[in-house]
A protein has these predicted regions:
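Low-complexity, Gly/Ser/Thr/Pro-rich intrinsically disordered linker/tail segments
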Residues: 66-103
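A charge-rich, low-complexity, intrinsically flexible signal that marks solvent-exposed coils, linkers
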Residues: 6-21, 90, 103
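Short acidic, glycine/serine/threonine-rich helix-capping segments at coil-helix boundaries
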Residues: 13-20, 24-73
Length: 103
């Protein structure tokens, strides 16, 4: 029960924990955008607006969670790779970020 109330509407605790972890690290807007991108990657027609509202939550809860979690990890890794490429001073953190993305 350590997850904020905001993420308790995600039925799968592993996915909720992952989204929460990403939101702590990169901010909730980016974490929510990556979830929405992952939903799109798994075939769901969802708007990428960074809002974890009822439409996104419903899409999350009806998704194949194994596929969605894999897609979310991939999206997070892509985010971190882009961040390291565009901000070279942060590239030293890439290895740790990728471990976090795929955890």
């Amino acid at each position: 029960d350590a997850l904020p109330i905001f993420y308790k509407d995600i039925k799968d605790v592993n996915l909720a924990t992952k989204v929460f972890d990403l939101s702590v690290n990169m901010g909730s807007n980016w974490a929510h955008r990556l979830v929405q991108r992952a939903l799109r990657a798994t075939g769901q027609d969802i708007l990428e607006d960074g809002i974890l509202g009822p439409i996104t939550l419903a899409a999350i809860n009806k998704a194949d969670l194994t596929d969605l979690l894999a897609a979310l990890k991939s999206e997070a890794a892509g985010y971190y790779r882009t961040l390291a490429a565009t901000k070279p001073k942060r590239a030293k953190f890439l290895k740790g970020w990728l471990k976090r993305a795929y955890a």
